[in-house]
Amino acid sequence: MSDGGGSVRQRKKSSGDGSGNRARKAKSTGSSGSSTPSTAQQHQMWARIVLMVGIAAIVYFTTFRTREKKFATQREVLELRTQPLDCSRPYLDEISKFAGCIPNQCGRFVSDKIVSPAEAGILLDLARAGFELGQSAGGASILDLHSGALSKGTQFVNVYRLPEAKKLFTNQHINVYRHVKAKVQQAVADNFRLNVDALHLTHPTFFSRLTNVTAKTIHDEYWHEHVDKETYNSFHFTTLLYLTDYGKDFTGGRFVFIDNEGKHNRTHVYIEPKRARVSGFTSGAENMHHVEQVTGGVRYAITISFTCDREYAMADPKFALDDDEEGEEEGGTNEGRMNEP
């Protein structure tokens, strides 16, 4: 009896404990349920997150914006297109020292009517002939007919010391090169209201050959943003003559001006290269630029640079053929190397 009665009491006690546990569990469950957001609260939370993301996106895109603008496309045939700009203060302060060479306004221009396609074709032949004698191991090769510098591997050689050069550069090449340089110089003077005699050819002036080959040296990395006046102290006006067509002879490789508008906004202004197209611009910070990386094909162009400072002026290149002709007239011979100006 005592064992049985004890057992009954024990069962009752256990039963009582179970009720307490269930009560505590129920209380705990109720407490947990009260801390979980309701469906309405969750919707409000997500709405706030979406709103904050939207506001952040609006602030970003109105504060940090890069617009794109096409200044000249490959399909267009342009008589003349210009874009005036305010001169950067350092550029204006320096160029104001040179009477007859102060632009009426800084800016840029592009024209397809300065150089003929036939002239561009002859210069393209000259470039290809020169680059047969040497090319960079990376994607950017240069040929400077004034200094004789020619990319070869990871270094430069003097093209006029190569015997083959005399056979490649013809009288037609030379005459067209000089004639085109004079026409481009006149175009710069006309567009910026300069005295053409106050404008002088300067170094470096060179042919370029760009491909998608991986860069091997810093000289192959042509795509970095820069200001010509900061890179080359002698520059006051920069021009480019394109010898091949964007979208036909090569892809990528567009010329890009970078116009900064305020602290964070900028506009990329594109020129699509076209055979015989000439672009020109003042060389100060108002015309920061770069060239897109070429993704296929070969891009040929000539950079023709001008200065207002006679100290940095250089003469037209004196080719080996000229020396040979002079040597024959004098009854002598020479080594066929370029004479320094």
Indicate where each model-derived feature is located.
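Fe(II)/2-oxoglutarate oxygenase catalytic core
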Residues: 2-341
